Amino acid sequence: PNRTIQILLYGPPGTGKTMFAEALANELNMTMHRCKASEIIGSYLGESTRNMRAYMDGIINDESPRILAFIDEFDAVAGMRTGHNSGADGEMNRVVNELLQCIDAMVQSNKDKCIVFVATTNRPWSIDPAILRGKRLDTQIYVGLPDLEARRFLVQKGLGGSVPPKSPDVDLEQLAKRLQGYSSADISTICEKIADQPLFRHFRTGMPSCVTQRDIERVLAANPTSVSPELEGRYLAYNRKKGF
């Protein structure tokens, strides 16, 4: 059907929000208009507003039947407006006003096409409420930290199989359990660092080696989670109130 669907994906950094948008575009064979909010923010007065209009006009004028519009780091261009109309605050107020007008124009332009507008943020509580109401981004989806099943998958992907070789004391199931509270990106990085340890030893000694439990302990000690329990709690509280 010819319609506009608008979704806000929120959650901790490194949980795959951007990958979700890319997968959606590929799966549905959609033309993707992708940008980061930092690409919209300009250095000169009025530049950010013009960049926002140019990006949204590209979506509105695209004649493709299925379009996915994607803005990463959305809170940088959609923050709560203030009562100040001068300086940096005034400029950001104008950017948000322009964004609201563009979203409404995008909804009205979809008579012969389907538009899915996806925005991602690590700070959903900082977004101007007007953007999250009515026919705008009123569908909010929490993309949280991986559960045990997802952590098992990530650990097996990074360390399973015969490469890298592992000593008998290595327990990947236990590692997956210990990685509770880590983001998907954190886990992938940790697995890469663990897998590199035998290679580093080989460079030093010239002898073949394998992943040991000591390697795992060393890497975990040097790489704490990037998401604190307090921050995760804030996301969960927001999700109970606003999302699903």
What is each stretch, according to the model?
Residues P1-R178, Y182:
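Walker A/P-loop NTP-binding motif of AAA+ ATPase domains
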Residues K193-Q197:
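Amphipathic alpha-helical interface segments
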Residues V96, S188-C191:
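Hydrophobic face of alpha-helices
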Residues P1-N2, M19-F20, Q174-T189, L199-F244:
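C-terminal engagement/docking regions of AAA+ P-loop ATPases
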